[in-house]
């Protein structure tokens, strides 16, 4: 019984080895060429394979290989742009700072007697530490959220 199983295994491996050795070796992209000593009249030399063999690719178009589909034609009428976010554009250069942000202007001074910081507000200026957003004519809701780039500047 063991001898029978061993012969089946050897026969199976032998068929795999003979397929690889008697068939011409494939080469080039997606294995469309064959490695030969001399290319046929309907083939063209591309590069060298192992053991001084040439990689030969057929000149005649073969339909057994899948070809790349042609590029789609893009018409200019089909291209559209979304201008919905252009209303929030301020026209400022790339400074990343918006005019909608107010900064807290407090002056800190050191008292010479106690060496503690003392914060004073100028009497004519009244500012808040929160970000103020002007009311927009295009929004219908009462509460307006600042843009995502300004979310870090808001203090809730």
Curated annotation (Swiss-Prot):
InterPro entries: Beta-defensin, Beta_defensin_dom. GO terms for cellular component: extracellular region. GO terms for biological process: defense response to bacterium; innate immune response. It is found in: Secreted. Residues 111-144 have a biased composition (Low complexity). Residues 1-20 form the signal peptide. Its main location: secreted. Disulfide bonds join 27-55, 35-49, 39-56. Pfam families: Defensin_beta_2. Residues 108-156 are annotated as: Disordered. Keywords: Antibiotic, Antimicrobial, Defensin, Disulfide bond, Secreted, Signal. Has antibacterial activity. PANTHER family: BETA-DEFENSIN 123-RELATED (PTHR15001), BETA-DEFENSIN 125 (PTHR15001:SF12). Belongs to the beta-defensin family. This is Beta-defensin 125.
């Amino acid at each position: 019984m063991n001898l029978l199983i061993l012969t089946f295994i050897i026969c199976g491996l032998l068929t795999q080895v003979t397929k690889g050795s008697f068939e011409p070796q494939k080469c080039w992209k997606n294995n469309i060429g064959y490695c030969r000593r001399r290319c046929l009249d309907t083939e063209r030399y591309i590069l060298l394979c192992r053991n001084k063999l040439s990689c030969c690719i057929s000149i005649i178009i073969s339909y057994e290989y899948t070809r790349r589909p042609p590029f789609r034609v893009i018409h200019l009428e089909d291209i559209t742009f979304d201008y919905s976010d252009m209303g929030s554009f301020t026209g400022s250069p790339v400074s990343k700072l918006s005019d909608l942000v107010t900064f807290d202007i407090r002056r800190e001074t050191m008292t010479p007697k106690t060496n503690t910081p003392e914060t004073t507000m100028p009497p004519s200026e009244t500012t808040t530490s929160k970000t103020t957003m002007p009311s927009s004519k295009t929004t219908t809701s009462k509460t307006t959220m600042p843009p995502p780039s300004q979310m870090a500047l808001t203090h809730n």
